[in-house]
Swiss-Prot record:
Belongs to the MalT family. It comes from Vibrio vulnificus (strain YJ016). Positively regulates the transcription of the maltose regulon whose gene products are responsible for uptake and catabolism of malto-oligosaccharides. Specifically binds to the promoter region of its target genes, recognizing a short DNA motif called the MalT box. This is HTH-type transcriptional regulator MalT. Monomer in solution. Oligomerizes to an active state in the presence of the positive effectors ATP and maltotriose. One of its GO terms (biological process) is positive regulation of carbohydrate metabolic process. The lineage of its organism: Bacteria, Pseudomonadati, Pseudomonadota, Gammaproteobacteria, Vibrionales.
Length: 902
């Protein structure tokens, strides 16, 4: 007796979401022999096939179960499905099958194809859940069927495993469409539609994306999350926030029933053991399980659709689906808890054989094996340090028992270096002193090599603390103590000697020392030290006036970061910071802004105090664009950070420049005076950061009309810059001197200084420093070019500067800043409506941005406010200016700009 439901298409598709991206791929199905839906349980293979074929007329459906491994039973159901798909064109063959009147399945299929010769319509036969078939006779018959079936027939197979139907041959000949779990997994858009269809409150894109990523788009898991959210009356956002605490009981029950209990005991044990690894290859699995057939087992499980995925681009590396991995861990801890420590210990040893200490440490910690952790740190700690794996190292060292830590001087030295490398300089001396004391308690002698390493480290701390004399003394002492084999500390000591020479203005000595440091660091693969040396060279070259050479050297630093995967090391932010400063000086503000924001991303997990440089640059960029409101927000950040932390003069000088430029633009002379009252005045100015600080002081005095003090500061600046051959700083100082001359009403001297500055700019390319004072020097530049007082290169540079100054002024006007609005409303010819219905400053800004072509969304982003707030501002300004629409707003803004001479 045949069961009709086995030949019935699935119903209840009303709740399934439409999958256009999958359906689009299936449009070409009539031209293929086989359409294979292959994925693990719960990916919606059957639902997708049914949805796709719902509007097709000639479809036969066969739902397979375990009992269909009987050849007679299988062939009869298959022929009934085929007969249905062909409108009864296989009746004779079906009768032969029912009466067992055929010698072989091949001969029967030959009769079937002969009967179908007059049927030319497109048709489909579906074999649903083919993975339960393990009868080789059936497989062989289906291979014959696929090879010889007519072109108008397409076979559709759903299976958890790769069916033995000659799929490799079909794939090579492009006769098969394969829909795998990558296609069947929901993307974020489909996840959003799925939940919106099931949950009354709907779902936002971020929540949908979080949930989708957690379950890797697995539809069954998403369905269970939706049901649980409804049952517990929780929003999906709450479910997403606590997704790791999600009640997995129903999901685990599903996997036990649909997957795990169907496996033999040996395979279940294998999966539970391997699940201790996040990702794995056959060598790891062999070391863990001692199974000679490790690779065969992995490939077999992959073929059978057991949630094992090959890693893209990796040879014989695999991972479990996230949730299946969690499920296996749960089963492992429930069924074989006594093996947990041993498995993790074996996993640690296996990872060591793969030269992966990071993973080995993780498993050694899970095995609660402190001695193994210490062994790994001893052997691989410095290598991991050189590769930038600082947080992993620090957490491992912090978890060691005191006896394990202080029994090994190598580990205590590593601990101190970790503090230094993460800018905790004030802890280094304490850590070294504690280590020395603890080692003595344990009768451990600290040899001269240890002392040399400690001195090299303390030298680095001294230079970071702005004590170059002490740094040089310690670095030279370290070099006299250290053997050439202790290469890391020798590299650091050499670097410190170079940095000291940089700080004290001996650039001709500093550069070769840093080049030597880079060479040694690359030779011994101490890559973050090589990166540091490149950055120092870049700053030295900038100071010497070779800015283009510095820029190109920075490119090599970016390559090093990419090659050695140092993207998350704090020095990456330092590189972006120096690059942003060069780009700002070259007036490439968009690129400088991008660097500053990237720097903030890199430091997002570090203390907010480290963000000062990025905010200083962002404020300067906003000031340069005339976006004073935006700049004001960055200035607030800067002031807050400077109150909260103590900084090196390099940091405070950069931040102070942004503060002074902002106060200068806003006319806040009291703020400038307050800053000047407490400003640090370095004893010398033989390096770029002390030069910058003294330039800030000179600028402050000029703004306040304190010309005698300004003159003294400028004389000191240029004297120091000349002594240390700081070419780029001389260039910047000349511009400030020209500003001073303008304030002194000495136009001739101002022009002489500007001419000299332009000549130096041919080498340095520095234009940003001209532009920040464009309103003061613009007229002088015009006079210089008109009177042919400049050489060709200087004239070209001056014309470009005038163009940029004009563009910046127009930009500020379009942004309708306070100064522009004040001039506008007092203009004798301004329309009465503008005078009697004054707009707020924010409404003027919005009008300017509308004129610039910004959409509402872009305006909201530019001013960093909500879209609804922008709509309110637009409604208000339309009402006040009697404007009906955006077009009229643009016309009004244009008329006002023309009135002001723009």
């Amino acid at each position: 007796m045949w069961i009709p439901s086995k030949l019935t298409r699935p119903g209840r598709l009303h709740n399934a979401i439409v999958r256009p991206r999958v359906l689009e791929l299936l449009q070409q199905a009539p031209y293929y022999k086989l359409v294979l839906f292959r994925s693990p349980a719960g990916y919606g293979k059957t639902t997708m096939a049914a949805q796709w074929l719902a509007d097709k007329t000639n479809v036969g459906w066969y739902s397979i179960d375990d009992s269909d491994n009987d050849g007679f039973r299988f062939i009869n159901y298959l022929l009934q499905a085929l007969n249905k798909a062909t409108n009864g064109n296989c009746n004779n063959a079906q009768k032969l099958a029912e009466k067992r009147q055929f010698s072989s399945l091949r001969s029967l299929f030959s009769d079937v194809f002969a009967e179908m010769v007059d049927f030319h319509q497109e048709c489909y036969v579906v074999l649903d859940d083919y993975h339960v078939i393990n009868n080789e006779e059936v497989h062989e018959a289906m291979r014959f069927f696929l090879k010889h079936m007519p072109d108008n027939l397409t076979l559709v197979v759903t299976s958890r495993a790769n069916p033995p139907l000659g799929t490799a041959n079909l794939r090579v000949r492009d006769l098969m469409i394969e829909i795998g779990n990558e296609m069947l997994a929901f993307d974020t858009e489909e996840t959003t539609r799925f939940f919106n269809q099931r949950v009354a409150d709907g779902i936002d894109e971020d929540t949908a994306n979080n949930l989708r990523n957690y379950v890797e788009g697995w539809p069954s898991a998403l369905q269970l999350i939706a049901l649980q959210a409804q049952h517990q009356k929780r929003t999906l956002a709450q479910s997403a926030e606590s997704v790791s605490q999600f009640n997995h009981a129903h999901l685990w029950d599903y996997l036990v029933e649909e997957v795990f209990d169907l496996l033999d005991a040996d395979t279940r044990k294998f999966l539970m053991q391997v699940s201790v690894l996040d990702h794995f290859n056959d060598e790891l699995v062999y070391a863990l399980t001692q199974r000679e057939d490790a690779l065969g087992m992995i490939e077999s499980l992959n073929r059978y659709g057991l949630f094992i995925y090959p890693l893209e681009g990796e040879q014989n590396w695999f991972r479990f689906h996230n949730l299946f991995g969690e499920f296996l861990s749960h089963e492992r801890q429930a069924r074989i808890p006594q093996q947990e420590q041993e498995l993790n210990r074996n996993a640690a040893i296996a990872w060591l054989k793969q030269k992966s200490p990071h993973q080995a440490i993780r498993h050694a910690q899970k095995a609660y094996d402190g001695e193994l952790v210490a062994e790994i740190l001893n052997e691989f700690g410095w290598k991991m340090f050189n590769q930038g794996e600082l947080s992993t190292l620090e957490s491992a060292i912090n978890l060691l028992e005191k006896d394990l830590l202080f029994s090994n001087p190598k580990l205590t030295m590593l601990r101190a270096w970790l503090a230094q490398s993460q800018h905790r300089y004030n802890q280094v001396g304490t850590l070294l002193a504690e280590a020395e004391n603890e080692h003595k308690k344990r009768n451990i002698d600290l040899d001269i090599q240890y002392q040399g390493q400690a001195n090299a480290l303390l030298a680095q701390v001294a230079i970071n603390s702005n004590d170059p004399e002490k740094a040089l003394e310690l670095a030279e002492l370290a070099l006299s103590q250290l053997d050439s084999t202790v290469y890391r500390s020798r590299i650091v000591a050499t670097s410190v000697v170079g940095e000291v020479n940089h700080v004290i203005g001996r650039l001709d000595r500093a550069l070769p020392m840093m080049q030597q440091t880079e060479k040694l660091a690359r030779q011994y693969q101490v890559y973050h030290q090589a990166l540091w040396a490149i950055l120092q060279q870049s700053e030295i070259l900038i100071a010497q006036g070779y800015v283009q050479a510095a820029f190109e050297l920075q490119d090599s630093a970016f390559r090093l970061i990419e090659e050695q995967q140092l993207q998350h090391v704090p020095l990456h932010e330092f590189l972006l910071r120096v690059r942003a400063q060069v780009l700002w000086c070259w007036n490439r503000l968009d690129e400088a802004e991008e660097c500053a924001y990237k720097g903030l991303q890199i430091l997002e997990n570090h203390a907010p105090s480290k963000h000062l440089h990025s905010y200083s640059m962002l404020a300067r960029i906003a000031i340069g664009r005339g976006e004073l409101d935006r700049a004001g927000k960055f200035i607030e950040h800067i002031q807050h950070l400077m109150k909260q932390s103590t900084y090196h003069v390099d940091w405070t000088a950069n931040a102070s420049l942004s503060l002074i430029l902002y106060w200068q633009a806003k006319g806040k002379l009291n703020a400038i005076q307050e800053w000047l009252n407490t400003a640090v005045r370095p004893e010398n100015a033989c390096n770029h950061f002390c030069q910058l600080q003294w330039r800030n002081i000179a600028r402050a005095h000029i703004n306040l009309g304190q010309y005698d003090q300004a003159r003294q500061a400028l004389d000191f600046l240029q004297s120091e810059a000349e002594k240390a051959n700081l070419v780029t700083d001389r260039n910047r100082n000349l511009i400030i001197e020209a500003i001073f001359a303008v304030h002194q009403k000495d136009e001739n001297q101002a022009k002489v200084l500007l001419k000299e500055a332009l000549q130096l700019t041919n080498q340095t390319g520095m234009v940003g420093n001209f532009l920040i004072d464009g309103a003061t020097i613009g007229t002088l530049l015009e006079k210089l070019t008109n009177r042919h007082e400049l050489g060709d290169l200087e004239r070209h540079r001056a014309l470009q500067l005038m163009k940029d100054i004009s563009s910046n002024q127009r930009s500020r006007s379009v942004h309708f800043d306070e100064e522009f609005v004040e001039k506008l409303v007092t203009h004798p010819n301004v329309p009465e409506l503008v005078r009697t219905s004054p707009l707020t400053q924010r409404e003027w800004q919005v009008l300017g941005l509308i004129y610039s072509g910004f959409s509402n969304e872009q305006i909201a982003q530019e001013l960093d406010v909500a879209g609804t707030t922008i709509k309110t501002h637009i409604r208000n300004l339309y009402q006040k200016l009697n404007i009906a629409n955006r077009k009229e707003a643009v016309t009004t803004a244009e008329n006002l700009l023309q009135l002001m001479g723009y």
